UniProtKB/Swiss-Prot annotation:
This is Translation initiation factor IF-2. Keywords: Cytoplasm, GTP-binding, Initiation factor, Nucleotide-binding, Protein biosynthesis. Residues 302-305 are annotated as: G4. It comes from Clostridium kluyveri (strain ATCC 8527 / DSM 555 / NBRC 12016 / NCIMB 10680 / K1). Residues 248-251 are annotated as: G3.
């Protein structure tokens, strides 16, 4: 880096070298030896900025530097050289004009943003404080850092507190192209009504696909092996001139997996319940998933054409899950339907549109497209294929998009019927070709100005987005629950309860919910009979919940998923223990207590000094026992003079594990040789005890 001499800089600034030398010392804490000394060009730029800011204060400069003491001038002339160093003395006063400027800066900027590290000089400039003040505070903090040395974020944060300035971590601008576009377009108020996105959920064999088939008026079920949905699809239907987009349910796992990734794509859930079967375990799971995601539910009571169908019984069961039908005074829409005879289908769709109208779903189609990946796969003939749900804007063939850490230019676009289309608007599902890699379901996509921008963002995201996503939500565990409550990270403790019998679930739910207090609310989001499954872990991960199992164990898949997702799974055989552990965690009682246990006492009766070994004490065990490698304290005249560990323990010439009461032994103390006859060696151990009572 180039350097500049003092006299050259003074000439540029049109001031004397003497004034410049004094300015450097008093304003920047930099001591130079004489006019031939050199400084870095970047430091010279700072000085120029300072002079320019004060150029209309010429009288101030003249008054300050015209009467420069002779002794100071002499000091600068001594030991001529070319070095520059930070002055390590504390200045007695600061220039009034600079103070006024600093006060103004601090009033206007109480917050500054920095990256992971910052140099001391850059930090000084950011907060508008003289470098000497910053270095002085660092020294008080025990950090010895020169002007160009870097400090980390935590140090900068503490340093900012010294100046009453909040230091924030600057988010890495890897999505600059996307962010700029969003800022420009978010101001656009040209929004219009968009179709609702509906997911169909329910228990196996309750007729989800048949209902969707009836709605679409096409025989999808007949083409699928065993009547089981083989793929995740998205379809659009039209009723009374209005569109509804259906996601052919990916099942509860994918529903919650998407939500765990931050992708909320469903506006309304149609919950399918068979009239002749009632609420089943997967139905209950679906209800809990919807509640956790805060998605409105429209209940379709299916198979009303079958003998044994009992609509009222289903409605009664729904009330147990706080879903009270409208005709019973509640706010849950329940529509009896038959996928077979198509009875009630139109009414169901009208109710979906009514629910959507209440939600006031809006989007702006006159902007660049963005949305979520519903499914993606690698096709041998076509490459990476992704089904996208456009949530805002319009997407067209030829557009460049960024999808998670993948990018591409749309080569072809197909609608839900497989027809080629050129563009699509909000709430419309499309299948696209042209991505560089297969994205993950739940990834967000954004349209950007060109493929180069998309590629640059994707490359940066590949380095950071995955780890940031995994770290974005800190999973709750009993061990650190108290700390998270205190830090304000946890306001609500979500719990999933699995047990061997229904009675145990009810008992646990009631007891756990009674633990709620002002700081944290305990909420049982799901309870079911049976082993802990991968589905439970997925829900726990999405809802940041703890899983409690009573007389049940997680299966191998659930264990692997829990480890991968950092979900806390606790199993118990006694309900009381589960309640006490949650209670203890909430008040911070899972931190262990330590208790000292006295093992024994021995009196030193003879001293042996052995070269290369040290001092050996011949002892008589008066109480308890002496144990090899145990902790000991040396007591002389009732006063503890040293604490250490037993280095060795012998009886006669043999090493022994312990010496019992009434026996003699020889021992040596780790790192201590100043023992005397009559000293007492007290052996003890530290036991860890977990508190179980509040």
């Amino acid at each position: 880096m180039s350097k500049i001499r003092i006299y050259e800089l003074a000439k540029e600034l049109n001031i004397s070298s003497k004034k410049l030398i004094t300015l450097l010392l008093e304003e920047f804490g930099v001591e130079v030896k004489n006019h031939m000394s050199v400084i870095e060009e970047e430091d010279a730029d700072l000085i120029k900025e300072f002079i320019e800011e004060n150029e209309d204060k010429e009288e101030y400069l003249e008054d300050k530097y015209k009467n420069l003491p002779e002794e100071k001038s002499e000091k600068f002339k001594k030991n001529a050289g070319n070095t520059v160093k930070i002055a390590d003395k504390n200045k007695s006063k600061q220039d009034k004009a600079v103070k006024d400027l600093n006060e103004q800066v601090s009033k206007e900027n109480h917050k500054v943003e920095i990256e992971d590290t910052i140099t001391v000089k850059e930090f000084s400039e950011k907060i508008g404080k003289p470098i000497t003040e910053v270095i002085k505070q660092l020294i008080f903090m025990g950090v010895m850092a020169a002007i160009n040395q870097e400090i980390d974020f935590s140090t900068a944060e503490k340093l900012g507190e010294k100046f009453d300035i909040t230091v924030l971590k600057k988010k890495e601008d890897i999505d600059k192209g996307v962010a700029e576009q969003d800022e420009d377009e978010d101001e656009d108020t040209n929004v219009e009504k968009r179709p609702p996105v509906v997911t169909v959920m329910g228990h196996v064999d309750h007729g989800k696909t048949s209902l969707l088939d009836a709605i679409r008026k096409s025989k999808v079920t007949a083409t699928e092996a065993g009547g089981i949905t083989q793929h995740i699809g998205a379809y659009t239907v039209t009723i009374n001139g209005e569109k509804i987009t259906f996601l052919d349910t990916p099942g509860h796992e994918a529903f919650t997996a998407m939500r765990a990734r931050g992708a909320q794509i469903t506006d309304i859930v149609i919950l399918v319940v068979a009239a002749d079967d009632g609420i089943m375990p997967q139905t209950a799971e679906a209800i809990n998933h919807c509640k956790a995601a805060n998605v409105p539910i429209v209940v379709a009571i299916n198979k009303i054409d079958r003998p044994g169908a009992n609509v009222d019984k289903v409605k009664q069961e729904l009330t147990e899950y706080q879903l009270v039908p409208e005709d019973w005074g509640g706010d849950t829409i329940c529509i009896p339907v038959s996928a077979h005879t198509k009875e009630g289908i139109d009414t169901l769709l009208e109710m979906v549109l009514l629910t959507a109208e209440m939600q006031e779903l809006k989007a702006n189609s006159n902007r660049n497209g963005k949305g979520t990946v519903v499914e993606a796969k690698l096709d041998k003939g076509r490459g990476a294929v992704a089904t996208l749900l456009i949530q805002n804007g319009t997407l067209s063939v030829g557009d460049s998009i960024i999808v998670g850490s993948t990018y591409g230019r749309i080569r072809a676009m197909f609608d839900d019927k497989g027809n080629k289309i050129k563009s699509a608007g909000p709430s419309i599902p499309v299948e696209i070709l042209g991505l560089s890699e297969v994205p993950a379901a739940g990834d967000r996509f954004h349209q950007v100005k060109d493929e180069k921008t998309a590629r640059d963002i994707a490359e940066k995201r590949k380095q950071k987005i995955r780890e940031e996503y995994l770290q974005s939500t800190h999973k709750v565990s009993l061990e650190d629950l108290y700390n998270q409550i205190k830090e304000g990270k946890v306001k609500e403790l979500n719990i999933i309860v699995k047990a061997d019998v229904q009675g145990s679930i009810e008992a646990l739910k009631q007891s756990l919910q009674k633990l709620s207090n002002e700081e944290v609310k305990v909420r049982v989001i799901h309870g079911a009979v049976g082993a802990i499954t991968e589905t439970d872990v997925t829900l726990a991960s999405a809802s940041n919940a703890i899983i409690i199992g009573f007389n049940v164990r997680p299966d191998s898949n659930a264990q692997a998923a829990a480890e991968k997702e950092s979900v806390d799974v606790k199993t118990y055989r006694v309900i009381y223990n589960a309640i006490e552990d949650i209670k203890a965690a909430m008040v911070g009682m899972l931190e262990p207590d330590y208790k000292e246990v006295i093992l024994g006492k021995a009196e030193i009766r003879q001293i042996y000094k052995i070269s290369n070994i040290g001092t050996i004490a011949g002892c008589y065990v008066q109480e308890g026992k002496m144990v090899r490698n145990c902790k000991v304290r040396i007591i002389r005249d009732g006063i503890v003079i040293f604490e250490s560990e037993l280095a060795s323990l012998k009886r006669f010439k043999d090493d022994v594990k312990e010496a019992a009461e009434g026996y003699e032994c020889g021992l040596s103390i780790e790192k201590f040789n100043d023992i005397k006859e009559g000293d007492i060696v007290e052996a003890y151990d530290i036991e860890e005890i977990k508190k179980k009572e509040l």
